[in-house]
C-alpha cells in the first residue's frame, strides 16, 4: 500500500523489506522467530543507507508496542542497530496501548516486553497514544470520525518538529544528540510526551497567525499531549521546545521563562534551567509559526503503571502464555520484563 500510494516514489524500491507473514500480535514471533529471519535483510538496507551518509546522526524508528511485529521485531532491530552503531542516537516513536481503546488482548504482554528492551537500548522514546490522538481530534479539531490519516497527521507534525533543526537553518539549533543530552537526566528516564501547537486538522491549516505567547500557552496545555498522561499529575524533569518560523528570539525566551516562573511547582527544583529551546527559521507548510513540545515528565509513569497492572492481571493466571512459550520464550523473561518496567 505504501508503494502504490502517493509516496511510492520517495523510497527506493530495493529499500522495501517485507516478509510473507505477520507476527500475529505475538511478540515472541516478532522478536525470536519470524522477525529474526527478516532482520538481516533489514540490516543490509540500513547498512547501505548508513554508508552513504557523511555524518550519520542516528536512527528513527516508528512502531507500535501493542502488536507483534512493531514491538517484537522493532525492538530486535533496535538492539541489532545498537550493536553495529553503538555511538549513534537511537530515537523511537512508539505507539503505546491506550487505556480505553484496545486492539488486542495481549497488548500488555507485548508492550511490557518491548519497554523492557526500550529502557536499555534507546536514547529517546516518544510515547504516542492513539487515545490521546483521538481526544485531540475530537476535542480540539472537532472531527467527528477521525481516521488513522488524521492521527498520523498529528504524529507527523511532531516527528517533523523534532528533526526540523537537522533539516533547516535556524537561529538556535538542536539536533537529536543535543536533545538527548538536554532531556535525559538519568539514562533510563528517556520516555517523553510529545505535544504540538497550533493544532490544525489536515484540510484546514488555520489562517490566523498565532503569537508566541499563544503558542507557548497551547503547547504546555495538557490537552495537547500526545500520550494519555496528565502532566499536572507529575513534574517535569526537563522540557524541550522547538519553535519554527520567523519570530523574535527575545519573545521566545521571555515566554519560556514566564511559563517556568508561573508554573514553577510543575518543574523539579533540582534541575534549575530545565527548559531547552530551539528556534528554526522555516515553518511547516501552511503555517506561519509552530512549536513542538517534548516533555520528560514524571507523569509518564501513569502509562507504565496502567500497562503493568494489566500485565500482572493476566500473568498471574498465566493467560495466553502458551503462545509465547511455544515460540521458545521462557516465563522468566516475562518476570524480568515486569520488574524492569
Curated annotation (Swiss-Prot):
Q: Where does GTP bind?
A: 64, 68-70, 130, 152
**Does ATP-binding count among this protein's keywords?**
no
Q: Give the family, as the similarity comment puts it.
A: Belongs to the tubulin family.
Q: What is this protein called?
A: Tubulin beta chain
Its predominant location is: cytoplasm
Functionally, this protein is described as follows: Tubulin is the major constituent of microtubules, a cylinder consisting of laterally associated linear protofilaments composed of alpha- and beta-tubulin heterodimers. Microtubules grow by the addition of GTP-tubulin dimers to the microtubule end, where a stabilizing cap forms. Below the cap, tubulin dimers are in GDP-bound state, owing to GTPase activity of alpha-tubulin.
The processes (GO biological process) annotated in the record are: microtubule-based process
The taxonomy runs:
Eukaryota, Metazoa, Spiralia, Lophotrochozoa, Mollusca
List keywords of the entry alphabetically. Answer: Cytoplasm, Cytoskeleton, GTP-binding, Microtubule, Nucleotide-binding
Q: Where is the signal peptide?
A: none
This entry carries the following GO cellular component terms, namely: cytoplasm; microtubule
